[in-house]
Design a protein with these regions (language model features):
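Long, low-complexity, Lys/Arg-enriched
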Residues: 1-124, 137-354
C-alpha cells in the first residue's frame, strides 16, 4: 500500500545537524531512497533557535543547501514544523532540567506521535539520534505505543571525526573543508564523511491499548495501560451496584451479563473446569446463581427462567442464550483494558465451551 505523506520526526537539542544527516541517510545514502514530504522537529526554546539559524536561515541554510546539492524534491520544513516543548503552565522550555520538564517532553512527544499515527495515509520515520537521551527514549517508546506496520525507527551513524562536529551537516558532493576541534586543528574534507542509517526494530503495541488511549492519555498513563498484560489479574464484583472492577478500571453491566460474569467468576474461583453451556445442567446452575443476586420481585428471574426453559430441548438454542452476554462482557473488557490485558480475564473467567 502506498501512503500519501511521508513524515520524518526528529528531536534535537543544540545540534540540529541530526536533521540534515538523517535526510541525507534516507534520501541519498539508502537504497531504495526514502524522501520525506515533511519534517517535524520536537525541541526546546534554545533548540528551536539553533535549528532556525542553522537550517532554515538564508545563510548558512543547511537544509536547503542539502536539498539543492543533491537535487531532492521540495520537502516541507519551516518554522511552523518546529514544535517547542512547553511546561505544565504552557511556557516554552529552555531545556529539560528536572522531572517535570521530562514529563512535559514525554507527554508532548506522545501526543504528537499519536496524532500523526492516527492518519492512515501518513508513513512515519522516527529518528532517535538527536536531543537529550530522554527525548530519544520518549520518541522510540511513543512509536512503539502507536506505530503501525508502515512506520520505521532509526538512528543515524556518522563516522569520526565528523560525528558531533558543529560545522558538519552532511557529506558534501564536492570538497568542503572544516577544521578538527581542539588545540591542534587539522583539515577535514566533508566529502569523505560517511553517514549511515541504523534501522531499529520495535514492538508495536497499538492494538493492545484500551480504546481511549488510542486518542488521548499522558505518556505515563499509556505506559501503565500497556503494562497491565504483565500483571496478575484482579477482579472485584459489587453485587449491589452490578459494578465490576478489573485491575483499576470500572465496568458497569446489565443484570443478566453481570449474573453471567459472576457465575463464571465463581466457577473460576473454585477451580472448576470450563462448562459446556449447551447442556441443560448449565442453565440450571446459572439460574441458581441469578436467583442469588437479582431482586425476586423484579420479574427478572422469571424472564430468565422462561427464556432458558424453552431452549433446553435444543442444545444449540441454549448456547445461543449465553453467547450474546459472553460477547458483551468480552467486548467491554477489551475496550477497557486492551486485547492482551483483557485476555487474562477472558481466558480465565470466561472459559466456556459452546
Amino acid at each position: 500500500m502506498k501512503h500519501t505523506r511521508r513524515i520524518l520526526i526528529c528531536a534535537t537539542g543544540l545540534s540540529p545537524q541530526i536533521v540534515t544527516e538523517t535526510i541525507y541517510a534516507l534520501a541519498v545514502a539508502t537504497k531504495p531512497r526514502w524522501i520525506p514530504d515533511e519534517v517535524r522537529l520536537f525541541t526546546t526554546l534554545r533548540g528551536a533557535e539553533s535549528a532556525r539559524l542553522n537550517l532554515l536561515s538564508a545563510a548558512p541554510g543547511w537544509f536547503q543547501r542539502l536539498r539543492m546539492e543533491y537535487g531532492l524534491p521540495p520537502i516541507r520544513f519551516d518554522e511552523h514544523c518546529i514544535e517547542i516543548i512547553c511546561d505544565g503552565e504552557g511556557q516554552p522550555l529552555d531545556d529539560l532540567r528536572c522531572q517535570s520538564d521530562n514529563d512535559a517532553a514525554a507527554d508532548h512527544i506522545t501526543t504528537r506521535v499519536r496524532a500523526l499515527a492516527s492518519d492512515p495515509d501518513n508513513e512515519l520515520h522516527v529518528s532517535i539520534a538527536g536531543g537529550r537521551k530522554t527525548m530519544g527514549y520518549y520518541l522510540g517508546y511513543a512509536l512503539s505505543l502507536y506505530g503501525r506496520a508502515q512506520d520505521r525507527l532509526s538512528h543515524v551513524l556518522v563516522s569520526p571525526p565528523f560525528e558531533s562536529h558543529p560545522q558538519f551537516f552532511y557529506p558534501s558532493r564536492n570538497e568542503r573543508v572544516i577544521q578538527t576541534l581542539g588545540t591542534n586543528p587539522q583539515p577535514l574534507d566533508c566529502q569523505r564523511a560517511e553517514v549511515q542509517l541504523a534501522e531499529i526494530p520495535f514492538v508495536r503495541l497499538r492494538d493492545d491499548l484500551p480504546e481511549r488511549f488510542r486518542t488521548s492519555g499522558s505518556f505515563s498513563a499509556t505506559v501503565h495501560a500497556a503494562n497491565r498484560a504483565l500483571l496478575e489479574p484482579h477482579i472485584v464484583l459489587d453485587i449491589n451496584r452490578r459494578h465490576v472492577l478489573v485491575d483499576d478500571e470500572g465496568i458497569t453491566l446489565g443484570k443478566t451479563p453481570f449474573a453471567v460474569l459472576l457465575w463464571l467468576a465463581k466457577r473460576a474461583q473454585l477451580g472448576k473446569p470450563a462448562i459446556d453451556w449447551a447442556r441443560p445442567a448449565a442453565a440450571d446452575e446459572f439460574l441458581a446463581m441469578a436467583a442469588q443476586v437479582m431482586n425476586p420481585m423484579s420479574g427478572s428471574i422469571e424472564r430468565i427462567e422462561s427464556a432458558l426453559e424453552w431452549r433446553k430441548s435444543a442444545a444449540i438454542k441454549l448456547a445461543q442464550y449465553f453467547e450474546p452476554h459472553k460477547a458483551r462482557i468480552n467486548k467491554l473488557f477489551v475496550q477497557t483494558l486492551g486485547e492482551r490485558a483483557a485476555a487474562r480475564y477472558i481466558n480465565r473467567l470466561i472459559l466456556v465451551r459452546t
